[in-house]
C-alpha cells in the first residue's frame, strides 16, 4: 500500500512496486487479511464476503470456502455479533474469494486466545494446503511461523537474516 524507499516487489515476473512504479492495489492480484480482520461493521458476513472484486465470478469457490471454514450459519450476522475466530475465518474467505496469486496476512492469529488460536491455526493450515496458495504471513510468534509455513524468512531492520524450511 506504500511506495517503497528502496527495493521492489515482483509478482509473476512483473514489477508491481518500486521507487518509480506503483501499481494500484486493486490491480495487483493479491489480497490482504489485516490483523484486526477489517470487516465492514455495517455489512453482514455474507455481504463482507461478496464485497471483493472477483466475488461475483467465484460463487462456487466462495460456497466451498464457506463450507471449509464452517461459517455458513454466520452469513446473516454482523461482525460484532460473532467471535474473533469467526471474524478471522470470514476475513479469510473474503480475501480468498478474489482468488489472488498472493495472499498477505498480517498477524492473523494475534487477536485470538490460546485455545481458539490453536483451532484456527489448524484450520488455516488445512485450508491453505488444500488451495495450494502462496501466502506471506507477518508474525512475531515463532510457533505460528514454524507451524503454518513451508518456508520462514527472518528480517531485521528490513534486511534478510535467515531463510529456512521449518522441520
Describe the residue ranges of each PLM region.
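ABC ATPase "signature
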Residues: 163-164
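ABC ATPase NBD coupling module
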Residues: 16-31
Amino acid at each position: 500500500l506504500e511506495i517503497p524507499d528502496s527495493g521492489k516487489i515482483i509478482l509473476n515476473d512483473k514489477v508491481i512496486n518500486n521507487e518509480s512504479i506503483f501499481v494500484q492495489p486493486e490491480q495487483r492480484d493479491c489480497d490482504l487479511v489485516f490483523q484486526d480482520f477489517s470487516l465492514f461493521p455495517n455489512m453482514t458476513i455474507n455481504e463482507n464476503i461478496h464485497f471483493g472484486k472477483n466475488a461475483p465470478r467465484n460463487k462456487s469457490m466462495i460456497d466451498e470456502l464457506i463450507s471449509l471454514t464452517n461459517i455458513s450459519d454466520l452469513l446473516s450476522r454482523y461482525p460484532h455479533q460473532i467471535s474473533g475466530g469467526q471474524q478471522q475465518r470470514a476475513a479469510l474467505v473474503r480475501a480468498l474469494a478474489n482468488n489472488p496469486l498472493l495472499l498477505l496476512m498480517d498477524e492473523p492469529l494475534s487477536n485470538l486466545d490460546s485455545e481458539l488460536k490453536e483451532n484456527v491455526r489448524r484450520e488455516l493450515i488445512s485450508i491453505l494446503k488444500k488451495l495450494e496458495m502462496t501466502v506471506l504471513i507477518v508474525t512475531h510468534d515463532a510457533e505460528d511461523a514454524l507451524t503454518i509455513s513451508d518456508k520462514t524468512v527472518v528480517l531485521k531492520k528490513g534486511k534478510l537474516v535467515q531463510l529456512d524450511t521449518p522441520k
